[in-house]
């Protein structure tokens, strides 16, 4: 619970400040809202007497709530990174495919920072955060979500128009 009391306001603050400078699309902003909602649900919804949604077993062995949250969340982070990078490019110019790859790398860097933060918290407070295997699976699903969105962005890239540029 303490993890949420610290992390949620920090993440909201980061998104608000970034949005002020970048001007994220409504889709990305709603993606952040949905990501935080499913993240909170995973940590707060009880499943039986000694589990929460995050660590409850699933019908599909490798697919758990936490991993789906990581895949979808870092897909959103990739889209946000894409929009941040595009905000620095000249209006009317096509966006190189490599920018989608760079956006995925930015999202994966964020995922690594979050895993470091989770590790540091476990040094001081008992949490439901798993051990090294959980961290590894989190990073794998971060990669899957970031890669899926990066591939979609690379395939559907459009030139940045002057209206989108003026929001920054």
Language-model regions, residue ranges each:
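Membrane-interfacial alpha-helical segments at the cytosolic side of multi-pass membrane proteins
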Residues: 72-89, 123-127, 143-157
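Membrane-embedded alpha-helical segments that form the functional core of polytopic membrane enzymes
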Residues: 96-110
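Alpha-helical transmembrane segments of multi-pass membrane proteins
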Residues: 15, 32-42, 78-82, 106-118, ...
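Cytoplasmic-side transmembrane-helix entry/capping segments in multi-pass membrane proteins
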Residues: 2-6, 23-37
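Membrane-interface loop-to-helix entry segments
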Residues: 2-5, 61-83, 136-144
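Membrane-interface helix-boundary motifs at transmembrane edges
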Residues: 15-30, 89-97
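Central hydrophobic cores of alpha-helical transmembrane segments in multi-pass inner-membrane proteins
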Residues: 6-16
